[in-house]
Each structure stands twice: as C-alpha cells, then as structure tokens.
Amino acid sequence: MKRLLLITLLIGYIYPCVAQDKPIRTEESLEGTVIYKKTTTFEVDGYTYQCDVDDGSQFVTLYNKENKLKYEKIVYKDTGKTYIGSWSSNVIEYDRFMSQQADFIVDQAFTKAMADEIGKTELMITMLLSPNTGEVMEVNFNFFTFEPYAKVPLHVYREIEVKLKEQIHFKPIEEGKQLNYIMLAWMQKPQGKLPPLPPPGSLM
C-alpha cells in the first residue's frame, strides 16, 4: 500500500510539470467548406474583397475591391504600346532581401495547421508596383476552387496584402519607369508559423 501511495504521489507531482513544459497548442486551421466557389464580394471588418471565379476552369482571382489595375494591360506610359516582357528583360533591380521578406510575410500569415493541411500545393501571389517608387500598390491571389486555398479565411489574405504594402519595395530601372505599373508574381507553398506559447506555469 505504501508503494502504491508513493507511485500515486509521484504521478501527481510529475504530471503538472509535464503539462506545463509541453502545453497544448490551439491554432486556426482551414475552413470546413469552400469559401471562394463563385464570384462574390466580401465585406469584412472595414475592407472589401472581390472574388472572381471562372466558371469553366474554376480559377479564382481574389483581390481588394479598391484595386484599379488588376485587369489593366501593362503599357508604356508615353506611347500606350503594350509591354511584352521576357525572362531576359528586367524592370527592377534584383533585391534578395526584399524577395526573402515577401516569402516570409506569406509564411507568417498561415498557421502551421493550415500549412500542414495545404500540403505541397502552391499559391500564386502577384504584386503590382509603382513604376516611380517601386512600392506595392496592389496585391492579387490566384488558386482553384478545388485547392485548399479556397478554404483559407479571408483575413489571411488581407494580412499578406497589408504587410506586403507596408514592408516591400523594389527599385525600378529605366525600363520599368516607363510603364504604367510593374508586375511581380511568384508561386509559394506557405510554411506557416508556430503559435506563441502561453506564459510559464499556465495551461491552455
């Protein structure tokens, strides 16, 4: 009986310590149903987003309703002639730090739970830059209705847009300065971030 009592006391002492050292994490995951399945306007917390869905391909374009350039062609300001880019033509100076920072912003907007559910599927992010300052003027997102990104809460996309506008800027070169705007797009599989741990001694 004394031995059983000792074991019981030890378990009662050790368990709270283990629970405090390894708190249970609770973090946001993807929505259970598709959010962006048809052309819709979303009005949330003081901002408005437009979701355009191509009925045939189910290709989604998600962007701030205030955007003006999404469906505008890239043209030379002086002549109005359409700009045709190529892999060999540059319109901005390469900036490794800014490129990495843009990736980081996208990663941090997603929780680890979301990133795990998304798997290897990539999201397309497009930034439209000012040809004068190189600052981000608009941000667009693209994916398909049958991909996990169609279940990502709107505030995640909003966070990416806001932080890209606040933190990212590139230096346009002479060619870029002649355009009405500069487009930069990339595909990324978000890594997600771990949620903050609770204060020492507390349980979630």
Show which residues each predicted segment covers:
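Sec-dependent N-terminal signal peptides
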Residues: L4-P16
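Charge-biased low-complexity segments
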Residues: Q20-M204
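Positively charged n-region of N-terminal signal peptides that target proteins for export
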Residues: M1-L4, Q20
